Amino acid sequence: MKIESTLSFIFILLFTSSIYGYNKENSCEKLMQNGNNLEAVDAAKKIKNQYDKHFCLGKAYYRSNMHELAIKAFNDSEEGAELPADQMFSILYKGIAERDSGSINISSKTFTRGLETAKLGNSKYLQMERRFLYQLGQNALSTNEYDESIDFFSKSIVISVNDDERAEGLDRLSLAYYGKKKLDKAIEYALKASNMYLKTGDLNNYADKQLNMATYHLENNAPDRSLRLLEKLEQFAKDNGSQYYEAKALLEQSLVFKSKGDEQNAIARFNIGFDIAKSIGAKDLLPPKK
């Protein structure tokens, strides 16, 4: 287990079927895999296939935080796509780049166009439909349009083809309900997402959802339930060798004890969690020591 940052951009491509034409073994991709993004830009420009050239160029620009150039490259790749699936990936990535450049409304229009394109293939492009629904949900969530995000995420879950996709949708659904302050629903879907993450072996996201649930229980006036979750997470982290989540669970326990008026246990948990976080250099967990 290790801490993971939340990335909006999709880098895992499913170009394993004949419906995709993109060559993921090109030199640009290989350079990006090693973190050489600017070198990948130069390599992409030398690729002869126009779709591969512009698509990988867009990814390399995006990874280099050059969002406007990425958007243009993805637009060019869409125009050069010979297969519908390649076209839809260009639309998908363009929408993500637009969102991350701050153009949420334009991004949502792009995702909606992609969704309509995917629907033209009936069930052939259900995976692409799910991706567009999920990204539309992300956009709605980011602008606090919780009812819309719930609708998009719910639809994405229905057509998910594996537990990883279902976990992802359930996770975001819990956040949308939390945004609406529907705490019982937020807890319900956080639990479902947590169990699904555990089933798939995604221990980082499992731990994060346990932390979310603890917060929801605390805000739902159930501090004892929150504490039990955090104590179980602390033990789970120990068993799986994650001092980061062990420290995080202890620091969260401190907050729960403080809410209950138990200063002695609050300080004790804080000090233990602080010392662990300090020993592993987890700066994001290091508030001023009491």
Where are the predicted features?
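N-terminal leader/linker segments that initiate helical-solenoid repeat arrays
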Residues: S18-E68, N75, P84-A85, F89
